[in-house]
Amino acid sequence: MFTMKKSMLLLFFLGTISLSLCEEERSADEDDGEEEVKRSLFSIFKTAAKFVGKNLLKQAGKAGLETLACKAKNEC
């Protein structure tokens, strides 16, 4: 009976340790997931800013060229 109690106690102890390790790994994985989401949001924002910036510069460039052509021809 005593050996059975020892083996049950050993199994309980090993199960508790393995459960603790699994919880630590799970929490570490969740932390990494949040960081990946932050990175992806930043990259989306960065891409959108580049797109808007390029389009604004194109529009400003077209308006500037039209103004220069207008002034050169004295049609303004």
Swiss-Prot record:
Keywords: Amphibian defense peptide, Antibiotic, Antimicrobial, Cleavage on pair of basic residues, Cytolysis, Disulfide bond, Fungicide, Hemolysis, Secreted, Signal. Expressed by the skin glands. Disulfide bonds join C70-C76. Residues 1-22 form the signal peptide. It is found in: Secreted. GO terms for cellular component: extracellular region. It comes from the Eukaryota. Residues 23-37 form a propeptide. Its main location: secreted. GO terms for biological process: defense response to bacterium; defense response to fungus; killing of cells of another organism. It holds the Pfam family FSAP_sig_propep. Belongs to the frog skin active peptide (FSAP) family. Esculentin subfamily. Antimicrobial peptide active against a variety of Gram-positive and some Gram-negative bacterial strains. Has antifungal activity against a slime mold isolate. Has hemolytic activity against human erythrocytes. This is Esculentin-2CG1. It comes from Amolops chunganensis (Chungan torrent frog).
